[in-house]
From Swiss-Prot:
Organism (species): Drosophila melanogaster (Fruit fly)
InterPro entries hit by this protein: Beta-trefoil_DNA-bd_dom (IPR015350), BTD_sf (IPR036358), CLS_fam (IPR040159), Ig-like_fold (IPR013783), Ig_E-set (IPR014756), p53-like_TF_DNA-bd_sf (IPR008967), RBP-J/Cbf11/Cbf12_DNA-bd (IPR015351), RBP-J/Cbf11_DNA-bd_sf (IPR037095)
Listed name of the protein: Suppressor of hairless protein
Domain IPT/TIG as annotated: residue spans: 429-519
Main location: nucleus
Subcellular location: Nucleus; Cytoplasm
Length: 594
């Protein structure tokens, strides 16, 4: 059962990291390339028969010129290769980064973090597909990828840098975004004093043969301090929207119920006239600068209008009843029937699957041919005209014709628990699920996700847990005893919930948004001699069979049993509070939502 509020939402280029070997003089100064070559030739012993007679002075001069040209070409090639390596190295994840300086997080520092929660959050919002550009044309990504900064940590870090004597320019955030291709330069983002920025001029050309790609956002401070590289989710490259009747065989181009979409309107196919459906200050409007991600839910045809409604699984087809809900504010539009559009005609009998970048219209259910429409920046109702010769079609205007596209979001959250760190904070580990294994004296928690490294430790609230790194997608840890949180308890007497965090060995805290719940037990558990070290060692030696068999039997759905001693809950963190429910009336034609 879903419940929603109704009808209301000059910096230089980034520094690169490279590794190279330099030959130095005895006094410590580096040799230039010519000196290095001479040094190598002097050190290299020569064996074999004597060579030919030395050439004449004219031949020597010609040979020297050729040799000098070859040296220049080699130096240019080496410089180009080094530049490419530097750009590639700056985008590589953790194992290729410099050594992380250890700065172990203390319990006091974790307690302070849990009290204040000065997180630094980066959200990359983008479309799931991108249309390819051919020849000299540039089909800019629409809607444009957006970067949002949430959390009070950004402002706090800026103020701390100023207090430490850093100038305003050195404390400013700098960001570049690119498509991960060496053929296209990264574009600078303007984040100075703002929490939002859109990359409006990104495109992918037909010379790029990739079928999928990811956006890369490189962030650093004006003083050159590297924050890291943050990647978007995977984006599929398409040539153009399909005009053929879609089938579910191309499921990656279809739109599933419960996924997020963006809607935009482009009058007379002019790029400058593009407006996006968006929610701001509790009202729907058509924005030329920001776009909203709306969850599209499939409803039963007989579902009545209500703030609470039952949703269905499956793919969205034309003619289906849907509900559009803003993914940020929770504001919802009335029940809509999605209809296919062809030459300013809404097709009443089309029933094929809705596909990426299709043009569609939204009929407002149980009204007299009213459609969701825009007029300048307002969202209004438009009454369609019946087609006298074709009763299965209705004529609509440009403002009621919307382009639909699926969207995705990559979110990264971190906090420097022991103060600023020298190494980039990326790769940021992401935890997708938790599985509780075993019970008794030693219960194990298995974390599944991405970007795990051996430098990470699992924390339950302000208690560090024994952690074992398995691979970049799996971590294991020992669940701490309840006495670590409730000193006087020998067993769990009442539900106790603690947040799960990952902490890097230089003090960076990565919140997971997941919690662990200790569930009540009837009494003290019988003591078992099994030690945590033995369990960890046994699991390391038996790393495949053990995990598979146990996780299938004891997954997160039944982990709350008293025998297991704990339970799991996943909570989505929202950065903006949902607005209160308010009564909003629709006005016909010339006015918007009030």
């Amino acid at each position: 059962m879903k419940s929603y509020s109704q009808f209301n939402l000059n910096a230089a280029a980034p520094p690169a990291i490279a590794y190279e070997t330099t030959v130095v003089n005895p006094n410590g100064s580096p040799l230039d390339p010519h000196q290095q070559q001479q040094q190598q030739s002097q050190d290299m012993p020569h064996f074999g028969l004597p060579g030919p007679q030395p050439p004449s002075s004219q031949q020597q001069q010609q040979q020297l010129q050729v040799h000098h040209q070859q040296q220049q070409q080699q130096q240019q090639q080496q410089q180009q290769q080094q530049h490419q390596q530097q750009m590639q190295m700056s985008l590589l994840p953790g194992p290729y980064r410099p050594h992380i300086e250890e700065k172990k997080l203390t319990r006091d520092a974790m307690e302070k973090y849990m009290r204040e929660r000065n997180d630094m959050v980066i959200v990359i919002l983008h479309a799931k597909v991108a249309q390819k550009s051919y020849g000299n044309e540039k089909r800019f990504f629409c809607p444009p990828p957006c970067i949002y900064l949430f959390g009070s940590g950004w402002r706090r870090r800026y103020e701390e840098m100023l207090q430490q004597g850093e100038g305003e320019q050195g404390a400013q955030l700098c960001a570049f975004i690119g498509i991960g291709s060496s053929d296209q330069d990264m574009q600078q983002l303007d984040l100075n004093g703002k929490q939002y920025c859109a990359a409006k001029t990104l495109f992918i050309s037909d010379s790029d043969k990739r079928k999928h790609f990811m956006l890369s956002v490189k962030m650093f401070y004006g003083n050159g301090h590297d924050i890291g590289v943050f990647n978007s989710k995977r984006i599929k490259v398409i040539s153009k929207p399909s005009k053929k009747k879609q089938s579910l065989k191309n499921a990656d181009l279809c739109i599933a119920s419960g996924t997020n979409v963006a809607l935009f309107n482009r009058l007379r196919s002019q790029t400058v006239s593009t407006r996006y459906l968006h929610v701001e200050n509790g009202h729907f409007h058509a924005s030329s600068t920001q776009w909203g991600a709306f969850t599209i839910h499939l409803l039963d045809d007989n579902e009545s209008e209500s703030e609470e409604f039952q949703v269905r699984d499956g793919y969205i087809h034309y003619g289906a009843t849907v509900k559009l809900v803003c993914s940020v504010t929770g504001m919802a539009l009335p029940r809509l029937i999605i209809r296919k559009v062809d030459k300013q005609m809404a097709l009443l009998e089309a029933d094929d699957p809705v596909s990426q970048l299709h043009k569609c219209a939204f009929y407002m259910k149980d009204t007299d041919r009213m459609y969701l429409c825009l007029s300048q920046e307002k969202i209004i109702q438009f009454q369609a005209t019946p087609c006298p010769k074709e009763p299965n079609k209705e004529m609509i205007n440009d403002g009621a014709c919307w382009t639909i596209i699926s969207t995705d979001k990559a979110e990264y959250q971190f906090y420097e628990g022991m103060g600023p760190v020298a190494s980039p904070v990326t790769p940021v580990p992401i935890v997708n699920s938790l599985n509780l294994n075993g019970g008794g004296d030693v219960a194990m928690l298995e974390l599944s996700g991405d970007n795990f490294t051996p430098h990470l430790q699992v924390w339950f609230g302000d208690v560090e847990a024994e952690t074992m790194y398995r691979c970049t997608e799996t971590l294991l840890c020992v669940v701490p005893e309840i006495s670590q949180f409730r000193g006087e308890w020998l067993w769990v007497r009442q539900p106790t919930q603690v947040p799960i965090s990952l902490v890097r060995n230089d003090g960076i805290i990565y919140a997971t948004g997941l919690t662990f719940t200790y569930t009540p037990e009837p009494g003290p558990r019988p003591h078992c001699n099994t030690q945590a070290e033995d369990v960890m060692r046994a699991r390391q030696n038996n790393n495949n069979n053990n995990i598979t068999s146990i996780s299938n039997n004891n997954n997160s759905n039944n982990a709350g049993s008293p025998a297991a001693g704990g339970g799991l809950q996943q909570q989505q963190q929202q950065h903006q509070a949902l607005p209160s429910i308010s009564e909003v009336q629709w006005n016909s034609h010339g006015s918007g939502l009030s």
